[in-house]
């Protein structure tokens, strides 16, 4: 663990950094700045490549490559320059604009500096950047991870399909089931929410300060700006929000977060059931020779991976409602209270990713205690009650259920 990790206030960037380091590429301050730079540059290039914008100075392909490199080669050193500019501007998006202007000047393209950020409000850049960050995380990381995780659940379900065992309803012995079937339940539930997350494509708007293309029409009222901006947003593989105020209404983001919240509940259920089967000695945990289960009771192998997953999933689900409820509400055409909340979107996903890794680790340690499971099943003849009273009903024996439970 690095010094920076040891000094982190949040365990996400401290204790659990190795479990969600990949999310730095999607939700860190660096990722946000880099994506803003990308959006600004791609908007400028989009304008330069659109023939109807005759007010722009002529440029060639070599110059376009120089412009493109501003975001393609963007790194931590360049991000530090943006942060230094922000100390002067006290405005994060304006700092990005100033940075790009300086970069254009440095490659001999001063003639383009006045067209950086043209027809944009900061929220055009911001909403598109956040949508892009979330969408890339959803498609590049979350969905592949879920698919891989659920594949392992299904393997366990198939492997343990023929291990018959007691089931428990209301904490009491109930009709028999199989260990594999109980894991198959979770496979199907996770698949359901995985499909919902797969449908949760993100959206963005690019229609100016109050959503009416005011500046755009001042620039050129003959251009079909909704069509132009739709084409630009679609180039990021995002859905286009034509109708908005200054802010994009975030309903697609809320849809995704709601689906993640529901998935989290299923994973909490899985964590608790695994914990309970371990406590019943139906599932054993493979012991590592170097790990310590308890500081005072060396015989113990605690189900810490499932407890860790449960705790972090609970944290994710405590944050998600706060983020959802705030981002769907904004005073009139815009207030800034959503800004600090948006910066915490990544936390909702980080706690989920920590949990998935803990669950993966915990599940790999599990093996069924076939002897214990078989002994308890064979010692529980009362669970045949359902089958017996059903056969009694078939043979038209009156009050079969009551007759079975009586002392007679």
Where are these regions (language model features)?
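A glycine-rich phosphate-binding loop feature that marks nucleotide/adenosyl-phosphate handling sites
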Residues: 209-211, 287-291, 372-377
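A structural signal for well-ordered alpha-helices, especially hydrophobic packing surfaces
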Residues: 47, 97, 104, 142, ...
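Conserved helix-loop functional segments at active or binding sites
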Residues: 159-163, 196, 203, 234, ...
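Glycine-rich anion/phosphate-binding loop at the beta-strand->alpha-helix junction
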Residues: 246-326
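Active-site-adjacent "gating/activation" loops or surface patches in catalytic cores
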Residues: 226-246, 250
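A helix-coil-helix interface module used to build multimeric assemblies
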Residues: 2-216, 220-229, 293-294, 304-308, ...
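Alpha-helix capping and helix-loop boundary segments enriched in small/acidic/polar residues
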Residues: 122-125, 170-181, 216-223, 243-254, ...
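Glycine-rich cofactor/substrate-binding loops
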Residues: 1-34, 62, 85-90, 281-282, ...
């Amino acid at each position: 663990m690095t010094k920076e990790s040891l000094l982190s206030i949040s365990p996400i960037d401290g204790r659990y950094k190795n479990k969600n380091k990949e999310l730095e590429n999607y939700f860190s301050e660096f990722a946000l700045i880099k994506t803003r730079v990308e959006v600004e540059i791609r908007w400028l290039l989009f304008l330069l490549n659109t023939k109807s914008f005759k007010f722009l100075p002529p440029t060639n392909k070599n110059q376009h490559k120089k412009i493109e490199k501003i975001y393609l080669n963007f790194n931590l050193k360049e991000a530090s320059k943006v942060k230094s500019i922000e100390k002067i501007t006290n405005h994060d998006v304006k700092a990005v604009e100033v940075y790009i202007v300086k970069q254009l000047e440095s490659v001999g393209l001063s003639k383009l500096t006045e067209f950086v950020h043209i027809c944009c409000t900061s929220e055009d850049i911001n909403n598109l950047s956040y949508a892009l960050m979330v969408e890339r995380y959803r498609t590049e990381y979350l969905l592949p991870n879920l698919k891989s995780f659920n594949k392992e659940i299904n393997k366990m379900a198939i492997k343990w399909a023929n291990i018959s065992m007691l089931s428990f309803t209301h904490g009491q012995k109930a009709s028999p089931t199989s260990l594999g079937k109980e894991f198959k339940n979770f496979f199907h539930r996770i698949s359901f929410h995985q499909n919902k997350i797969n449908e949760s494509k993100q959206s963005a708007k690019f229609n100016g300060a109050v959503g009416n293309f005011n500046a755009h029409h001042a620039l050129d009222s003959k251009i079909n700006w909704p069509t132009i901006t739709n084409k630009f947003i679609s180039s990021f593989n995002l859905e286009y929000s034509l109708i908005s105020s200054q802010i994009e209404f975030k309903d697609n983001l809320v849809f995704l977060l709601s689906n993640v919240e529901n998935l989290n509940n299923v994973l909490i259920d899985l964590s608790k059931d695994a914990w309970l089967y371990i406590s019943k000695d139906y599932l054993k945990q493979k012991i590592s020779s170097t790990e310590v289960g308890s500081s005072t009771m060396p015989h113990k192998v605690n189900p810490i991976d499932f407890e860790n997953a449960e705790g972090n999933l609970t944290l994710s689900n405590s944050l998600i409602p706060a983020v959802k409820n705030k981002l769907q509400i904004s005073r009139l055409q815009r207030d800034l209270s959503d800004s600090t909340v948006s910066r915490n979107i990544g936390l909702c996903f980080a706690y989920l990713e920590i949990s998935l890794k803990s669950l993966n680790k915990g599940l790999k340690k599990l093996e069924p205690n076939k002897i214990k499971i078989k002994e308890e099943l064979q010692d529980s003849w009362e669970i045949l009650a359902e089958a017996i009273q059903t056969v009694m009903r078939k043979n038209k024996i009156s009050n079969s259920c009551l007759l079975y439970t009586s002392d007679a």
